[in-house]
Amino acid sequence: MGATGDTEQPRGPGGAERGGLELGDAGAAGQPVLTNPWNIMIKHRQVQRRGRRSQMTTSFTDPAISMDLLRAVLQPSINEEIQGVFNKYMKFFQKAALNVRDNVGEEVDAEQLIQEACRSCLEQAKLLFSDGEKVIPRLAHELPGIKRGRQAEEESHRGSPIPKKRKGRPPGHVLSNDRAAAGMVWKQKSCEPIRREGPKWDPARLNESTTFVLGSRANKALGMGGTRGRIYIKHPHLFKYAADPQDKHWLAEQHHMRATGGKMAYLLIEEDIRDLAASDDYRGCLDLKLEELKSFVLPSWMVEKMRKYMETLRTENEHRAAEAPPQT
């Protein structure tokens, strides 16, 4: 009636007449502020369109897809931070790889060892997010709940499909690695347990008159001098004792070996090496150099440690420990 702020304009079905003017609240000077209702209608329609687009982007019902979309956005930043962590510890991997190459030989690819060590770190890091029920399969193979986006990437890198878990298959199938899935037969042989039993694994055979040799000299005596440590790979059933710092100090004092610092030093039983040299595998071998075997005896305190070590490694004791009832 008399107040300007109470003035109303007739509205159509859309809330205002197209092209008409609407009087808003009075300004500071008491003058009405004119508002174009058509602009209000346009703004309202834009809000509605934003609402529809928002509904479309959140219409996914598969939680794995939604989480993988978020992971894909964050992955570059995550990779950058992970790379920074590996750069922090890379000097340790590099020193270890170079040490392995010095011990084994120049044919060792140090860079490949570093890459494999980094991949193993990532595999073990998966345990940080395990559900506590399926820890063993995650140790040896891919996570059961692997994201769909990563499946295509890993299949393209491996060149073989990811084996799917099916009902009725034995647990050993789940634990098989990529080489076994690719059909490599030799992997099954490497999975056979090493038998540590019989007279050669009887701790009673070790005494103060037993003669021992360094693993490096045994390696040369059997014609494997070019590759250090090959004897342990070819004959894993042999008893070998890793000398601790106290043992290495005594061996160096007696001039049986040079001070090796942090390098490993293994002791083997001389009788075992000579039995190998007389076996069919080495009979008639021109590379045998048994004169390299510089045998020696050990003090009683070191022999006692070796007895206990052999006792713990015996296959019979492993079976007893597995069959023993749990302590309550």
Swiss-Prot record:
Any one GO CC term of the record: nucleus
The UniProt record lists the keyword Transport: no
Disulfide-bonded cysteines: none
Record localization: Nucleus
Ranges for region Important for dimerization: 56-147
Region (Disordered), start-end ranges: 1-30, 142-176
Basic and acidic residues compositional bias, start-end: 142-158
Pfam family, one: DNTTIP1_dimer
Protein name: Deoxynucleotidyltransferase terminal-interacting protein 1
